[in-house]
Curated annotation (Swiss-Prot):
Keywords: Chaperone, Cytoplasm, Ribosome biogenesis, rRNA processing. GO terms for cellular component: cytoplasm; ribosome. One of its GO terms (biological process) is rRNA processing. One of its GO terms (molecular function) is ribosome binding. It is found in: Cytoplasm. Pfam families: PRC (PF05239), RimM (PF01782). An accessory protein needed during the final step in the assembly of 30S ribosomal subunit, possibly for assembly of the head region. Essential for efficient processing of 16S rRNA. May be needed both before and after RbfA during the maturation of 16S rRNA. It has affinity for free ribosomal 30S subunits but not for 70S ribosomes. The gene is rimM. Residues 97-170 form the PRC barrel domain. Belongs to the RimM family. It comes from Bacillus cereus (strain ZK / E33L). This is Ribosome maturation factor RimM. Binds ribosomal protein uS19.
Length: 171
């Protein structure tokens, strides 16, 4: 059975020429939405995702706008509103050392270098220069950890464990 990963959500159409407005859920939108790539649409009703080939991609405000081969007007893409864009696991590709997919990081337990448990990574934010990991703490407010070498000391994906150095003012 194929394992699928969400890379975007179709939230609306854009214009009359078949463009769709996508909220990106992928780590690498410029790579994932490249012209010629194949994505899979999974509608809200379930069922097996079906392939579509990207014929154009551009960014508009906070959205990615895509068109697909064979879908040239708004009436043909209207049916996709609310659907998810997916890729199979074999399309994920290899990452460089020290790079991780969001789904690998989310759910990892976070401990200090002294072994104190801080919580679990629940979300990854990409505000600018580096990612920020949102740690759900057992009690209290969420903790924001920058993904930089000075803070993140070790990431063990197999054991779902991240070890961090607590810099002054971080907690």
């Amino acid at each position: 059975m194929t394992k699928w990963f969400n890379v975007g959500k179709i939230v609306n159409t854009h214009g009359v020429k078949g463009e769709i407005r996508v909220v990106s859920l992928t780590d690498f939108p410029e790579e994932r939405y490249k012209v010629g790539n194949t994505l899979y649409i999974s509608n809200e009703k379930g069922g097996e995702p079906f392939p579509v080939k990207i014929t154009s991609h551009r960014q508009h405000k906070t959205f990615d706008l895509l068109t697909f081969e064979g879908y040239g007007n708004v009436n043909e893409v209207e049916q996709f509103k609310g659907s998810l864009l997916k890729v199979p696991e074999d399309q994920l590709g290899e990452l460089a050392e020290g790079e991780y997919y969001y789904h690998e990081i989310i759910g990892c337990n976070v401990v200090t270098e002294e072994g104190e448990a801080l919580g679990t990574i629940k979300e990854v934010l990409s505000p600018g220069a580096n990612d920020v990991w949102v740690i759900k703490r057992p009690k209290g407010q969420d903790l924001l950890i920058p993904y930089i070498d000075d803070v993140v000391l070790q990431v063990n994906i197999e054991n779902k464990l991240v070890t961090i150095h607590v810099m002054e003012g971080l907690l």
